[in-house]
Amino acid sequence: MSDQAPKVPEEMFREVKYYAVGDIDPQVIQLLKAGKAKEVSYNALASHIISEDGDNPEVGEAREVFDLPVVKPSWVILSVQCGTLLPVNGFSPESCQIFFGITACLSQVSSEDRSALWALVTFYGGDCQLTLNKKCTHLIVPEPKGEKYECALKRASIKIVTPDWVLDCVSEKTKKDEAFYHPRLIIYEEEEEEEEEEEEVENEEQDSQNEGSTDEKSSPASSQEGSPSGDQQFSPKSNTEKSKGELMFDDSSDSSPEKQERNLNWTPAEVPQLAAAKRRLPQGKEPGLINLCANVPPVPGNILPPEVRGNLMAAGQNLQSSERSEMIATWSPAVRTLRNITNNADIQQMNRPSNVAHILQTLSAPTKNLEQQVNHSQQGHTNANAVLFSQVKVTPETHMLQQQQQAQQQQQQHPVLHLQPQQIMQLQQQQQQQISQQPYPQQPPHPFSQQQQQQQQAHPHQFSQQQLQFPQQQLHPPQQLHRPQQQLQPFQQQHALQQQFHQLQQHQLQQQQLAQLQQQHSLLQQQQQQQIQQQQLQRMHQQQQQQQMQSQTAPHLSQTSQALQHQVPPQQPPQQQQQQQPPPSPQQHQLFGHDPAVEIPEEGFLLGCVFAIADYPEQMSDKQLLATWKRIIQAHGGTVDPTFTSRCTHLLCESQVSSAYAQAIRERKRCVTAHWLNTVLKKKKMVPPHRALHFPVAFPPGGKPCSQHIISVTGFVDSDRDDLKLMAYLAGAKYTGYLCRSNTVLICKEPTGLKYEKAKEWRIPCVNAQWLGDILLGNFEALRQIQYSRYTAFSLQDPFAPTQHLVLNLLDAWRVPLKVSAELLMSIRLPPKLKQNEVANVQPSSKRARIEDVPPPTKKLTPELTPFVLFTGFEPVQVQQYIKKLYILGGEVAESAQKCTHLIASKVTRTVKFLTAISVVKHIVTPEWLEECFRCQKFIDEQNYILRDAEAEVLFSFSLEESLKRAHVSPLFKAKYFYITPGICPSLSTMKAIVECAGGKVLSKQPSFRKLMEHKQNSSLSEIILISCENDLHLCREYFARGIDVHNAEFVLTGVLTQTLDYESYKFN
């Protein structure tokens, strides 16, 4: 840093809570404090981890357990210099980055290219400089000449590469072998000096594509094969020339390696061993491709080389807006932990034969109609059932571009696709005849055949349009699929032989797929016949209901546009609907709350609602809560009956398994949950249920269909995250705020983020929220259908919306609006308004007294005599009055429990303040002490005002006076270490505060068995105590297996209250 620290914009780091790991430059800390950043004492509480050492265990814990961004101190310095918080992505200190440990010197490149290379190297963990010195590990130079080049040749420690090395490392996300990128391997053509001949040169270069190579990159492979000049890509002159003739390219026929750089979104997943072949393979002939559009983050300014940038602009017109937003989001400060996000399919492709991997990728995005065949074959033949098959999201804007790319790849990869249009149509007709004539297979059904049927049904249009979409992707650009014949080099001939072998394998695979498709079709036909019969019965029932509804609601049909509509997926054509929908799908019906013709006041939005409550009274330990519900319902115009009767309009219940629920459904009453009631209270309007949590669950209260699952969540915040926690609890699953290898499911809002990356790496299934909602509503098949594409689609408009066929019977009662009589409306309309005015008049007097209004203290005491006081167990208004009196007497409110001398409480409560203060305060007194001090205008002796709570002391079997005496003699947890698992309740920060006030220390890293035994056997080392909870027991499996005690939170909570160590009462068995 410079001697004079830069000026920090006011409150620049106001939202930053940082935790420093290792030695950090004091000036960096000063900059953070000057920008109003807050330092926290535990990494779980931080928003940013700052460290130079990426291999520190605390850094790994912050990344993997707490999902926190880790940045180098340079992030602080550069953010100050730029005047804004920079994205954290490019400042990771971790050693897994591509260019970690590399210091590159840039020479003989244009300023524009230098900026691009500099940004790429530093973004991926390296350093750049313009001076060639001892620190340099690499010299990046486009031509084998110059002083720096000659100097670097004499030093074995410096590796000399062309700029292509940087680009290839980034695009393939791995550090490439520098030996193949030495600039002396470039072969040059004679440069034309006359400007008049530029056009002729361009034509010659274009013609050379037909004779030899289209590879412009200055790689050894291209130079050995007689490619054009290697410095064209980084020469400003040649860039200008080339942009005229070559930027207009056709993706469907361009198989050159430049396409890989132009789009920056394709990179090989499986590469041949021969480096030369690898460098020269045309794009469309790569054995396996992974979409990595989000992997190469854009960097500020004109970072990409001119040619790449120009081609990106040409190709970018066809890119979907969502891909652009993903790339922009990589630099957005709001995206905390976006690293190299891979396509949903990359883990699937790791251990597959190359032909299967390629089929998976090439068919995943545009050819959704083939997903069932491919997925079926993968699950049957490649053990892919342990991972997810997820489609790439395709928007109409990119569909044409991707079709062209896929058509070319399919032309080269699939022999069955390498046919003329007439042959394809004939082949399809034969397939259709074979399928229609195929009898029901005699062999046992494939274990995933049922899955495939449901998958087909879950995607309308998909099965019926296969025969239409299949040829379109071949025939769309037929004239563009055949480029002029290129000259085959020796290694290309070898590759051609390999490709023929791949084609034979693929042909066999496609035959297997056809056989499986026939099997699926026959099973599908049987299911369709059953569905048609069910639909006919359903329609008859619906017609009767419609007639009843029309007779009841005819006067109000003109005003139905004001009513709430429940969103139902768009209707399919009748023929498709019969063949595809898994359950009978009725016509779209409008859902009503109140009669839309009647205006219901907000304060009485439950007018006309008569509630009965089932299930909840048995579940509630606090009966006062039930009384509160009844009071709130009545305050908003509703009534509550003690039992379910025919006059009830709503049944508030948790489960569909009860006699009250069965009766309510028979009588077409509205069955909803307390969560629905909470939602309508917020909206001040009775709306139909529209979330899975609004409907009673399909199993008895306390049923646990997901008892074997440990669920984590990513992408959901605030109320959505709370809803998922509740859904996991109702399903009987364990919920963890962190992600570890023991988690069985990750529920994602979007396929992004560190948790998503880790889940893919650890083979943890990633699903949408609909998966959990379906289980709650009775689709228990979802437990084994976790890999279905319907649960791995993350572009849902509302992921919490219920699946329609699971709630048809529950929505039936909402198709008839609730009527409110005019008399009831008039009798209720006025009183609530009067009450509202009364409340408005009273409200100002009940506001809190502000601290600013407190008069200055009349007495000034020395620090030794000044009481530092905390209050617990009082209403806020009462606390403000006490604080006023305390200030007048010259006392202070303690900043924390550690600095507290007096705790004022009216009874023993297990609040954080009480449990932290009991270990450190001198006195715990009643409010009467403060009142008496104020009356005497001085602080008096506390002995006569010591808190005594006989009821609590009997309940917890302790004496508060004795506990205080023990705490004064010696801290309870002195010389004791605690490891507390992250999902503990109360929170980890609360437990840490309680332990530290009692003299203990909390370990940030989970101790190994060896470390535990070392501390246990060596009396000179501190004891380590393990604290966990039910949801975190999977983290303690090793401890249980080796007979090590693990305690629950009461070991700490009750321990500090009684000031005793009880090693027996709170152990997990």
Swiss-Prot record:
- Annotated region (Disordered) at 188-271, 428-494, 543-592
Please list the GO biological process terms of this entry. Answer: adipose tissue development; chorion development; chromatin remodeling; DNA damage response, signal transduction by p53 class mediator; DNA recombination; DNA repair; endothelial cell migration; negative regulation of DNA-binding transcription factor activity
Superkingdom of origin: Eukaryota
Give residue spans, biased composition: Low complexity: 219-230, 428-440, 448-494, 543-552, 565-580
Which keywords, in A-to-Z order, does the entry hold? Chromosome, DNA damage, DNA recombination, DNA repair, Nucleus, Phosphoprotein, Repeat, Transcription, Transcription regulation
Motif Nuclear localization signal, residue range(s) on this chain: 702-719
| Impact reported for residue 676 to A | Abolishes interaction with TP53BP1; prevents recruitment to DNA damage foci
This entry carries the following GO cellular component terms, namely: chromosome; histone methyltransferase complex; MLL3/4 complex; nuclear matrix; nucleoplasm; nucleus
Bias type Acidic residues, positions: 188-208
Mutating residue 910 to Q has which effect? Answer: Abolishes interaction with TP53BP1; impairs intact cellular response to DNA damage
Q: Name one Pfam family in it.
A: BRCT_2
Q: Which portions of the chain have biased composition (kind: Polar residues)?
A: 553-564
Name the consequence of residue 929 to A: Abolishes interaction with TP53BP1; prevents recruitment to DNA damage foci
Q: Which residue ranges are recorded for the region named Interaction with TP53BP1?
A: 590-1069
Residue span of region Interaction with PAGR1: 94-183
Subunit structure as annotated in this protein's UniProt entry = Interacts with the C-terminal transactivation domain of PAX2. Forms a constitutive complex with PAGR1 independently of the MLL2/MLL3 complex. Interacts with TP53BP1 (when phosphorylated at the N-terminus by ATM). Interacts with HLTF. Component of the KMT2 family MLL2/MLL3 complex (also named ASCOM complex), at least composed of the HMTs KMT2D and/or KMT2C, the common subunits ASH2L, RBBP5, WDR5 and DPY30, and the complex type-specific subunits PAXIP1/PTIP, PAGR1, NCOA6 and KDM6A; required for the association of PAGR1 with the MLL2/MLL3 complex.
Q: What is known of its domains?
A: The BRCT 1 and 2 domains mediate the interaction with PAGR1A.
Q: What is this protein called?
A: PAX-interacting protein 1
**Which species is this record about?**
Homo sapiens
